[in-house]
Amino acid sequence: VTTRPGEQLDFLDSVYSPKLTRGFSIVVRRMFRKQFASVHAVKGSLDVIRSLDRRLGPAIIALNHSSWWDPLVCVLLGTSEIPSRTHMAPMDIAQLRRFKFMRKIGIFGVSPDDPRSLPRMTRHVIERFGREPMCTLWITPQGEFRDVRDEIVLRPGAGAVAARACEKREIPVLALAIEYTFWEDKRPEVLLRVQRVQPPDLNDHATRSERIEAWTGEIERAMRENQSSLAQLVMERDPRPFEILLGGKEGANHPLYDLWLRLRGKHGRIRARKAEKAAASLSQKGVSPAPIGGEPS
C-alpha cells in the first residue's frame, strides 16, 4: 500500500543469525531432496559462485523470479557454496510480517509500491556492506513473479544498489537463472546457470541517475542472455552440460518403471541427444550461449 505524504516509511530490518541460517539450510536441503529429482547447475556456474568465497568484499546476485522456491534456492547456494559469506535479501514487508523468522536468515522488509523504498533499501544495503565486508545481496529485480518465457524487464532496485556500491570500488555482480522443469523423472528438476554481469562503461562525470540506468541495463542484458542460454539447454534435455548440486541418483523413477526400461535396453535417466544435433539446432536459430564468465567469446 502506498504511504501518504508525511507518513513514515514502512521498513523492517533483518536480524541475521548465522546459526539459524545453517539450521534452516538443513531443512531446505531436505525439502529439495523430497520435492525434486535433482538440482543441477550448468558446468562452470558453481565455480563462479564459489569464487565469491575467496574474495573479500560485498557481492550482488540478481535472479529471475518464477517460483515460491526461488529464495530457497538462494539459501541452498548460499550455505553450500559460499559458507563464509553473510546474506541479505529484500521482501515485501507484508509477507515478511507473516514469516518473521525469515528476518534471521537475512530478509528485510520493504514497501514495493512506495517510491521512497528504493533510496531506503539502497541506503540499508550500503550500510550493511560497510559493516559486513563478506555480505551478499540476493535480489529479484523483476519485482514480481514472472514466467521464465517472459522477457526480463527490471525495476531499478538492483541497478541502484550496484551503482552506489560500485562508486568507489568494483564489486562482483552475478546473474542467476533458475528453471523448474520435468524431464523423465516423476519429480521435477531444478536447473541453474550463473553468469557474470559486465560493469557498464561510465565516465567520471556520469550522474547518479545515469549510473543507475546503465547498471540496470547491464544487469537486465546479462539476465536475459543467461535465461536464454539456460532455456536452450533445458529444451535439449541433455544432462551432460550440467553438474549435480543435489540429488540426481540413478533409479529415481518407480522400480517397476526402471525394470521395464532396462528390459527395453534403456535407462531411467535423460538420454543425451547427440552433441552435433544440439549444436546444429542452436546454429540454425542463430543462438550463441552467453559465456559463464561474462567475457567476450
Stretch-by-stretch model annotation:
Residues 3, 10, 53-115:
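Catalytic core of membrane glycerolipid acyltransferases/transacylases, capturing the structured
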Residues 27-65:
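Helix-to-loop junction immediately C-terminal to a conserved catalytic motif
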